[in-house]
Amino acid sequence: MSKMRVYEYAKKNNVPSKDVIHKLKEMNIEVTNHMATLEPEVVEKLDHTYNKKNERPQASAPKEKQKAPVKPKNYVDDFDDEDEEVVKTKVPKKKSANKKKEGKKHDLQLQQQEKKIFHQQKKKIKGKAKAKEQQPVQQEQPMKKEKELPKKITFEGTLTVAELAKKLGREPSEIIKKLFMLGVMATINQELDKDAIELICSDYGVEVEEKVVIDETNFESIEIVDDPEDLVERPPVVTIMGHVDHGKTTLLDSIRHSKVTEQEAGGITQHIGAYQVTVNDKKITFLDTPGHEAFTTMRARGAQVTDIVVLVVAADDGVMPQTVEAINHAKAANVPIIVAINKMDKPDANPDRVMQELMEYNLIPEEWGGDTIFCKLSAKTGEGIDNLLEMILLVSEMEELKANPNRRATGTVIEAKLDKGRGPVATLLVQAGTLHVGDPIVVGCTYGRVRAMVNDTGRRVKEAGPSTPVEITGLHEVPQAGDRFMVFEDEKKARQIGEARAQKQLMEQRNMKARVSLDDLFEQIKQGEMKELNIIVKADVQGSVEALVAALQKIEVEGVRVKIIHAAVGAITESDILLATTSNAIVIGFNVRPDANAKRVAESEKVDIRLHRIIYKVIEEIEAAMKGMLDPEYEEKVIGQAEVRQTFKVSKVGTIAGCYVTDGKITRDSKVRLIRQGIVVYEGEIDSLKRFKDDVKEVMQGYECGLTIKNFNDIKEGDVIEAYIMQEVERK
């Protein structure tokens, strides 16, 4: 016996589908509707049930059971049979044949009409039967259970009615009804404020929590407080600073046992490099900051990310200008300093002289009663290197350097470049958390996904913990050295924040105050009531520098003072321009020229450079510019007089004075004073000036006009109206 559906079985046994489904449920057989399939065993059980029920009626009328259902007459078949008979029994008589043909035609039309009516009736009966079968099944479907209410919901800012309904697991119409009962007319897409959300949720007994929205675009200012239990010890980040050619890179080369110096042009470090070494099973991260004075800003950045500064001073050379700069940067960053006295292998080495010179900068050796660690070493021979590394680890332990590796990574860009094969490449120093390959990241004003990570030895790594320098690829643009980076939960969020930061930077650049120049000093430098002109002086010899500084400081103009922020011997360099950029200063060159880099940066940063060969020309130019900075002096200039000959009072306008211009002219934008019998009654501005019915800008001598004075109506015949302007006068 084959499978059959519920409705087929019901039709076969002449019973409703509802009855069959009911019987199946009594037999503990689950079916959903009349289209459900019945297995042969189930059909046998149903047959057994229905046979028992119908035993008596079958015995009394056995013939009825065998009777086939009455089929509708097939008029088409009958017609075919008749047609055959007509063909077989042809009659030679023409008249009788014609009559038969006409009758056949008439019968055919009747049969077609009856057949059409029959099919229409059949369709109606089938449709009604189907509807009857489906109706009870639909009624028996179980009702939807309401979802359980959540104990607590969270939201940011606002929620629409649809969003709130989704969070509560209710229909939006139900929420709209509740709001209506509370007196709030709302639609499905209407936003609800915090009060409305709390009212609805309290009605359902659900707790509400509002998430505080943090502006993640400014992630540098976000301070994440870690649990002390999550903090682990991290390697110290050490910056090696010092004067050019004092042996910084050679020292690092000795520590790493690699030839870094040979790869660099001229033996001078071109970029900040980051390297990691292992000492006594502990790691130390080194940043090699360029020592040349042209890289002032790079050195300042190096001090910001470092934990310990190793100040390299040559034993045979002593303290130099760049040494002092390095000390100032380290102190500004509040970073402990370890002094490494290098080149001890040289015959003219004098470490005591170096110690004596450094005492002037408050770096006193421990052996002389101070707290600064001094290490005597030779980077060339390797003498004293181990002692220096031990001192670095000792200071690191004292500083208790710790970080949480189990959170999203943050840190700083050490350097960045555009590689022809790999695209934007950035060297990052991870300062907190762990950076993984595949992390969505925002770096400065760009974003991307960490595609690959390479450590300082050139090996690919999958993750980098705190104080680890790595080179990454996968950014959309090249970031700036010194930019901060942060990892986000997904690339979509990283892209949004990166684009928002780029847009913000663009707006800041547009609104950035223009650099000061001697041509527009009056417009550019105003800080409250205090006027100040910042100047950087560069000259060919020290005598010229001193003479120029003294002459500039003697310039006396009321309310303005000269501030020399930097004065030195030598050509105008890139670092001078960068200093002028940050301090909004003018650069004056005396018998010197700017180098190519300085010119390029000055053009891009709009820094004003003035070059002179004669000192008094410098003084004259600066003095003239400073005088222009002062608030201008004004004097009054009378431009005309008019006599009031008649007055008219108009409601909502006031008193109109009919005047005759006796001298000069009266202008629409001039100020006026009303004089009555030689006494000034009122000073103010003209509200309107007309000739006849037309507004005019001015009325010349000998013409009549009508005018009103702003906020004044006490005008009488015979009054004199004097027009004047305030004219700027050059300060002497």
Swiss-Prot record:
Residues 42-67, 104-117 have a biased composition (Basic and acidic residues). Pfam families: EF-G_D2 (PF22042), GTP_EFTU (PF00009), GTP_EFTU_D2 (PF03144), IF-2 (PF11987), IF2_N (PF04760). It comes from the Bacteria. Residues 242-249 are annotated as: G1. Residues 342-345 are annotated as: G4. GTP binds at residues 242-249, 288-292, 342-345. GO terms for molecular function: GTP binding; GTPase activity; translation initiation factor activity. Its main location: cytoplasm. Residues 90-103, 118-129 have a biased composition (Basic residues). Residues 288-291 are annotated as: G3. PROSITE patterns: G_TR_2 (PS51722), IF2 (PS01176). Residues 233-402 form the tr-type G domain. Keywords: Cytoplasm, GTP-binding, Initiation factor, Nucleotide-binding, Protein biosynthesis. Residues 267-271 are annotated as: G2. It is found in: Cytoplasm. Residues 40-147 are annotated as: Disordered. GO terms for cellular component: cytosol. InterPro entries: EF-G-like_DII, EFTu-like_2, IF2_II, IF2_N, P-loop_NTPase, Small_GTP-bd, T_Tr_GTP-bd_dom, TF_IF2_bacterial-like. Residues 378-380 are annotated as: G5. Belongs to the TRAFAC class translation factor GTPase superfamily. Classic translation factor GTPase family. IF-2 subfamily. One of the essential components for the initiation of protein synthesis. Protects formylmethionyl-tRNA from spontaneous hydrolysis and promotes its binding to the 30S ribosomal subunits. Also involved in the hydrolysis of GTP during the formation of the 70S ribosomal complex. This is Translation initiation factor IF-2.
